[in-house]
């Protein structure tokens, strides 16, 4: 038990035993590195066999984690038993892959890996093409990975839908995370859950690999100077603009930059360069990024700098530091800071201010008590925003306004436009194909690897200046 693999095995065994439980609500609260992906799959398989359930559905916030997890599941369960269903997956037009294309439309495979957006928007949809999957969600084990990532504005409707699936569709729900949100107050007061991870407090102490240090408010130049002295460091800031400014100031050998302003293919290329550089222990590497590296990116740094954000985000960032526990935790620091004069990201100021308050009260913000307190405060202050568009109201008094709900329910708000960037030759060839042969599904999925999303205001400016053209 005093080794990482020993602890992972303990958690895995506990999940297998718990698989014999009746259908219902389960939590799997496992610290980073505790093997929650395999443990949750083991629980789901045992539970599905016990109750003759038909599918295991993994619901994940980021496509980057989906691709990673789906590959793990394929290695265990075989290629044909796992279906990825999200915007970046491409089953092409070949006869060989047609069954997978059809399966992706109605989720007709034993294990389905999908996004929060695909899952919930199918359930709240009014179009038959979106609703085709619903009969295959019934009698399934549904696992929400990184459950704390459910958008606050839709939290109550999402929880209400989970309860509906458990009560009427013979479905079991697993909320899986290292930072379990305090959802008891939102679920029905009579709803009970079973925790799958044994001895949670002890597990969190064992897997603690870093020391948190609060730097408070610092100057931009001070941050630059600190990063210049680091050999292997990751710095995560809250805006793309700030990330770009830091990168430009630091720019040099071994300094890298990642943000969603770069199209997916470009990001993958940069990640490959970073991994190659980090494989040589003698070389320095400093990465400046936005929060996109907090999940699904397999990188390991000696130090992590995280601009103040929600406690869950800070803990996610800490997961990129001393990942395998090889270094002493005293030598693996996570520095929390804010930059003097830097504006707070719209919609994130409450999360940041709650974290600042908790940094005064708790020496270690990864403490389970601190995590629970963070979510309690967040849900208390945002109580009136947890169903911001009154989705639940549309189902009261025997009203079933699915068309209205479908128009209201968008986990990703539609205030952005997609821009295709044909810099690489493959993208230019693809653009030529689209112009001459039209928008096929497979072509559009390939095109998504060369696309970025920009806000409407910026789009209008660029379009007006003739920088962006319509295809």
Regions found by a protein language model. Give the residues of each.
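Inter-Walker segment of RecA-like/P-loop motor cores
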Residues: 78-124
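C-terminal helicase lobe and adjacent C-terminal extensions/tails of nucleic-acid helicase motors
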Residues: 166, 221-228, 241, 245, ...
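Conserved helicase motor
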Residues: 63, 83-97, 238-241, 255-272, ...
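Interdomain hinge/linker at the junction between the two RecA-like core domains of SF2 helicases
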Residues: 172, 176-228
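ATP-dependent helicase/translocase motor core
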Residues: 1-26, 374, 397, 414
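Conserved Walker A/P-loop ATP-binding site and its immediately adjacent core
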Residues: 45, 53-76, 89, 182
């Amino acid at each position: 038990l005093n080794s990482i693999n020993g602890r992972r095995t303990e958690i895995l065994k506990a999940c297998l035993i718990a698989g014999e439980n009746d259908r219902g609500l389960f939590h799997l609260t496992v610290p980073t590195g505790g093997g929650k992906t395999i443990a949750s799959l083991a629980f789901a398989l045992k539970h599905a066999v016990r109750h003759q359930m038909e599918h295991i559905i993994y619901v994940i916030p980021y496509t980057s984690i989906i691709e990673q997890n789906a590959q793990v599941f394929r290695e265990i369960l075989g290629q044909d038993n796992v279906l990825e269903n999200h915007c970046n997956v491409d089953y092409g037009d070949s006869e060989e892959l047609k069954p997978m294309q059809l399966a992706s439309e109605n989720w007709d495979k034993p294990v389905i890996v999908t996004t929060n957006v695909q899952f919930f928007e199918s359930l709240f949809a009014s179009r038959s093409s979106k609703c085709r999957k619903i009969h295959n969600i019934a009698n399934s084990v549904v696992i929400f990975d990184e459950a704390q990532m459910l958008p606050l504005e839709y939290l109550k409707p999402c929880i209400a839908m989970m309860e509906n699936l458990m009560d009427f569709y013979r479905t079991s729900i697993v909320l899986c995370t290292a930072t379990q949100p305090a959802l008891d107050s939102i679920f029905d007061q009579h709803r009970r859950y079973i925790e799958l991870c044994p001895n949670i407090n002890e597990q969190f102490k064992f897997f603690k690999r870093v020391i948190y240090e609060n730097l408070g408010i610092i100057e931009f130049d001070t941050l630059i100077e600190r990063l210049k002295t680091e050999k292997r460091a990751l710095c995560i800031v809250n805006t793309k603009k700030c990330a770009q400014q830091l990168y430009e100031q630091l720019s040099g050998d071994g300094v890298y930059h990642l943000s969603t302003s770069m199209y997916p293919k470009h990001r993958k290329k940069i990640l490959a360069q970073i991994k190659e550089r980090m494989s040589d222990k003698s070389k320095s590497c400093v990465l400046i990024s936005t929060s996109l590296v907090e999940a699904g990116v397999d990188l390991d740094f000696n130090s992590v700098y995280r601009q103040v954000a929600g406690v869950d985000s800070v803990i996610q960032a800490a997961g990129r530091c001393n990942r395998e526990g090889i270094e002493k935790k005293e030598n693996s620091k996570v520095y929390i800071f804010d930059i003097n004069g830097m504006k707070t990201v719209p919609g994130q100021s409450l999360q940041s201010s709650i974290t600042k308050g908790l940094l005064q009260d708790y020496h270690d913000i990864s403490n389970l008590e601190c995590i629970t307190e963070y979510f309690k405060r967040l849900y208390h202050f945002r109580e009136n925003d947890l169903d911001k568009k009154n989705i639940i109201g549309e189902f009261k008094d025997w009203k079933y306004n699915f068309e209205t709900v479908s128009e209201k329910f968008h986990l990703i708000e539609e205030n952005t436009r997609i821009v295709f960037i044909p810099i690489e030759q493959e993208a230019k060839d693809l653009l030529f194909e689209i112009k001459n042969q039209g928008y096929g599904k497979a072509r559009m999925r390939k095109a998504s690897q060369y696309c970025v999303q920009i806000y409407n205001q910026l789009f209008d400016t660029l379009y007006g200046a003739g920088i962006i053209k319509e295809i």
